[in-house]
């Protein structure tokens, strides 16, 4: 997946209660960027093509090439679906 697409998908859920998870090609695992207690605070596409996300207790950097799905698990009452 393209890094610009991922940042565009994540921008609407910044500061919302819920969990963002990424599914990677070739694995059955999903990686949680944040948890329900620590909402996503920011996302940006870095000049090197990697995606950087931030939350209260830190930040993450990942290569978007292997991402096949972005999931948004909204807190009850927040709306939103499973896949962005």
Language-model segments: residues:
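Anionic N-terminal interaction surfaces
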Residues: 1-39
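Detector for intrinsically disordered, low-structure N-terminal pre-sequences
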Residues: 4, 19, 50, 66-69
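Short linear proline/tyrosine/threonine-rich motifs used for host-factor recruitment
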Residues: 22, 33, 51-53, 61-63
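Acidic/polar residues in short coil/turn loops that connect beta-strands
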Residues: 25-27, 48, 55-57
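Structured surface patches comprising rigid loops and adjacent beta-strands/short helices at the edges
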Residues: 36-43, 59-77
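Conserved beta-hairpin
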Residues: 42-52
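A generic structural signal for beta-strand entry/edge sites
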Residues: 48-50, 76-79
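Short acidic DE-rich linear segments
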Residues: 81-84
């Amino acid at each position: 997946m393209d890094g610009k697409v991922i940042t565009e998908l994540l921008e609407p859920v910044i500061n919302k209660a819920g969990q963002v998870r990424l599914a990677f090609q070739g694995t059955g695992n999903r990686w949680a960027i944040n948890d329900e207690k620590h909402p996503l605070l920011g996302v940006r596409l870095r000049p090197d093509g990697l995606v950087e996300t931030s939350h209260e207790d830190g930040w993450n950097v990942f290569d978007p090439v292997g991402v096949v799905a972005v999931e948004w698990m909204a807190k009850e009452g927040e709306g939103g679906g499973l896949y962005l």
